[in-house]
Amino acid sequence: MLKRDCCCGCKSAEFCTCKNKKSCIPNNLYEKIRNVFGYEVFEKLNNLRPYFDDLHSSTYIGKLDDVWVQIRIPSDSKINYDNETKLVEKFKDYFYYKDGYIIKKWFPGVDLFKVKIDSGIKKAIFNCVKNFQNLNVDKIEKFDWFKYPIQDAEYKALVKKYSKEPLVLSHNNLKRQNILVNKYGFIKLVDFEYVALNNKYVDPVSLYLFLGIPKEDIIDFFKLDPSVFDDFVFLMRVYNEAMYLNDYSKNNSKSLSPFDSKSLYSNKDFLELNRFIVQKNHNNFDNKLNISKIEKFYFVPLCVYEDEDRTIWKWINSKQLSSFNNHQIKVLAKAMRTLHDSDVEFPEYILSKKINWYLDHMEIKTLLEDLKGNKRINEIIKWIKQIKPDANCHNNLNFNNIFFNSSDNLYIIDWSVAYRNNRYLDIAFLFENTQMTPELESLFWKSYGMICPKDFYKYRIIVHFTAYLYNKLLNTDFNAAKVNTKRINEIFEKLNIKD
C-alpha cells in the first residue's frame, strides 16, 4: 500500500479520519485529478485509496458522490490514448476521460486469474469478443505491427501477406487481468490502451495464447481457418516478445530475484479484518486439495471458510519473513518430513501433464534460444520423466505462505498447488524460492533426516523450468521468465553439465 504521513498521523489516506482528508491522498493524486478534470470533479470524490500499479499507470478506487469508481492515472507518456478515448466515449460507465486519465464506474467482478474458465464462462467470453469486434467506432487508427524493431523475415512476410485483409475493432491485449466476470457470469473487457483496428484473428488467438482456451473451440466458434490461426499465433508471440524487450525489460527498475520470478505462480492474497484470504487461481491443474484433509496437521492454521473461489484462514500474528534462523529451519524441516510421510490422500501427481501442456503451447524457437539448445531441453524433460512421486507435497513453499508466530509456532498456508510429488522437488522449491544459504540448507537436511542427493541440482533446474514455462505462457511476465532461464543456465554452467 502507498503510504504518506497525514495531519492526523494515520499514515495512509485509506484510514484517514481528519477533516482535511484530501490532502492525505498519496502520489499527488489531488493535484493530478484537479489539473485534468477540474476542481468541481475532484470535490465529488471521496474514500480514495491505492488499488493497483503497473508499468503504464496507477489505479485507485473511491466514490464519485455515492457511486464507487475506479480512477486510472497514466505514468507512461509514450502511450497514445486517442483510440481508447474514442472508444470509451461509447460506454456509459466511463464518466470522465482525458489524456489517459479515466474515472469509470466500478465493476463488481474479478479477473480470470480467480475463476475457472468453464464452458459457460468460455461461451460468454466468445460472445463478448465477437460483440466487441462488431462495434462501430469512428476514426479508430490501425494497429501498427512494426511499432517495435522486429527483423524476423517470417514475421515480415506474414504481416505483408495479411495486410489487405478486412479489419475489425480489436482489443489487442486480451489477457486474464483484462477480462472481468461478475457473479452472474457477465463478462466485461477492460484496459483499452492498445485498442485499434486489426485482423479478426488477433483477439481470438489471444484467448488461446493467454487464457489457455483450446484453439479448436475458438476456431469453431469464430469460424476461422486453422492455418491462418497458426500464422497469427506466430505473429502474436513475436510481437509480444518485442513489446516486452522494448517496454518492460528496459524500464523495469526492480531487480528480480528467483523468488520474485515465481511470486505470481501462486494465488493472490489479501487481508480483511482478522482474516487472511487466498483467492484461488483457477486452471486445469490447481486447487484440487480439499483443505479439510490437512486440518489435522499442527502447521496448518484454522480454515474459517472455503469455497470454489477462495480460502479464508484465521489471521496469524506474524511478521513477513525475509530469511530463516536456525531454529525456524529445524522446525520447518521436521514439518515437511511429517507432511511428506503422511498417509493423507493428496491429489494425484500431475507435473508431467502440466509440463506437456506448457510445451504444446510453447514456441519451440523461443524455448531453444532461452535454454541454449535442444540437448539441454531434452535433458530437463528426461529428468522430469524420471521423477517418482513419493510424498505429499506443498509444491510452492515461499516467504508468502510460511509464517512463525511470536511463540515460533509454524503455520503454512496456500495449498493451491499441493499434490503427490517427489519430496526432493518440494524441498528444491523451498530452497530456490527463499534463496537459502548453503549453511541453512545443510542444517535443513540434517533436521529432515536425509542426506542431500548428489543429483539435487536436477530438482533445482526443474523448479525453474516449470516456473519459466508458466511465466512465458500464462503469466506473460517475460522478465520473470528471464530470471528463471538465467538461474537454469547458471546451474548447468556451474556444475559443468555437458549439453
UniProtKB/Swiss-Prot annotation:
Domain of life of the native organism: Bacteria
InterPro entries cross-referenced by the UniProt entry: CcrZ_PhaseVar_Mediator (IPR052077), Kinase-like_dom_sf (IPR011009)
Gene3D superfamilies membership: 3.90.1200.10
Name of this protein: Uncharacterized protein MHO_3780
